[in-house]
């Protein structure tokens, strides 16, 4: 696992966007796994700026979804499919034909979960998976004590998560779905490169547990320690609880530019 400490969210976004740009240069049809939420927005903005300037050609890129609400119509403005269309696909100049995700409206939800795992494998696997992290160490909707070998499956949202997400539904918690489909930790670990971005002091404990704690289901993100190519990008605030912060800064400062992340 590589830990990169940056000054702020913008710097983290630019660093990760550059890694994605380099990947697309090597493999134009790369399958990029993307996440929703506010944390990855600086990544998408930086990558879209490179595409707009002509520095990056993303026309053949493919986009894979990390999770989706169950029972929310695909065209609903707050379905994660719609959110990713607005925040990722359209800014990169991609249509929905470049997108793949689980069917949250399927009658057979378990079948839809299994079908998505198979679709990811059939597509050649995810080349680079973006991740955020919760204050409790969750990735995707894999909450603490999720199996580290879990596959794409249905999960029940906690009441607190529904309360938090109500702001996207006009403040009405009754509109927030009770369930989601999420890639499992085992599914996530199959991506060739995992890149986790965490910003803000509120994520400091989770980052410390992920990077320096034991691999344990109580902190799902700690599973990244098992991956051969995992990069954790954190700002100074999110790195504030890392005992080895100085070491991480030193090793990254001495890294040759050509190596990337």
Curated annotation (Swiss-Prot):
One GO biological process this protein is involved in is: N-acetylglucosamine catabolic process
EC number per UniProt: 3.5.99.6
Task: Please name the InterPro entries in this protein's record.
Answer: Glc/Gal-6P_isomerase, Glucosamine6P_isomerase, Glucosamine6P_isomerase_CS, NagB/RpiA_transferase-like
Q: Which GO terms describe its cellular component?
A: cytoplasm
- Show the catalytic activity: alpha-D-glucosamine 6-phosphate + H2O = beta-D-fructose 6-phosphate + NH4(+)
Q: Which domain of life is it from?
A: Bacteria
A Pfam cross-reference name: Glucosamine_iso
| Residues annotated as the enzyme's active site | 67 (proton acceptor), 136 (for ring-opening step), 138 (proton acceptor), 143 (for ring-opening step)
Which pathway features in its UniProt record? Answer: Amino-sugar metabolism; N-acetylneuraminate degradation; D-fructose 6-phosphate from N-acetylneuraminate: step 5/5
Q: Which UniProt keywords apply?
A: Carbohydrate metabolism, Hydrolase
- Select a single GO molecular function from the record's annotations and give it: identical protein binding
Matching entries from NCBIfam families are given as:
nagB, PRK00443.1-4
Function comment: Catalyzes the reversible isomerization-deamination of glucosamine 6-phosphate (GlcN6P) to form fructose 6-phosphate (Fru6P) and ammonium ion.
Q: Which PANTHER family match?
A: GLUCOSAMINE-6-PHOSPHATE ISOMERASE
Q: Which family does it belong to?
A: Belongs to the glucosamine/galactosamine-6-phosphate isomerase family. NagB subfamily.
From the Swiss-Prot or TrEMBL record, give the protein name: Glucosamine-6-phosphate deaminase
């Amino acid at each position: 696992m590589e830990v990169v400490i940056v000054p702020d969210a913008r710097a983290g976004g630019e660093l990760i966007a550059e890694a994605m740009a380099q990947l697309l240069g090597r493999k134009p049809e790369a399958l990029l796994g993307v996440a929703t939420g506010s944390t990855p927005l600086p990544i998408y903005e930086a990558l879209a700026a490179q595409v707009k300037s002509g520095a990056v050609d993303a026309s053949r890129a493919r986009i894979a979804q990390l999770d989706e609400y169950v029972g929310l119509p695909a065209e609903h403005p707050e379905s994660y499919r719609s959110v990713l269309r607005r925040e990722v696909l359209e800014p990169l100049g991609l249509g929905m034909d470049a997108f793949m995700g689980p069917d949250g409206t399927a009658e057979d939800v378990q079948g839809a979960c299994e079908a998505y795992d198979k679709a990811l494998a059939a597509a050649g696997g995810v080349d680079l998976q973006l991740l955020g992290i919760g204050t409790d160490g969750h990735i995707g909707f894999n909450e603490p004590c999720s199996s580290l070998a879990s596959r794409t499956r249905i999960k029940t949202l906690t009441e607190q998560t529904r309360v938090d997400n109500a702001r996207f539904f006009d403040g009405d918690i009754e509109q927030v779905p009770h369930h989601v489909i999420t890639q499992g930790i085992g599914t996530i670990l199959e991506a060739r490169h995992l890149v986790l971005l965490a910003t803000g002091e509120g994520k400091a404990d989770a980052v410390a547990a992920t990077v320096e704690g034991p691999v344990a289901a109580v902190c799902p993100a700690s599973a990244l320690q098992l991956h051969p190519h995992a990069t954790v990008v954190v700002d100074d605030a999110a790195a504030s609880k890392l005992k080895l912060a100085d070491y991480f800064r030193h090793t990254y400062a001495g890294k040759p530019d050509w190596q990337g992340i």
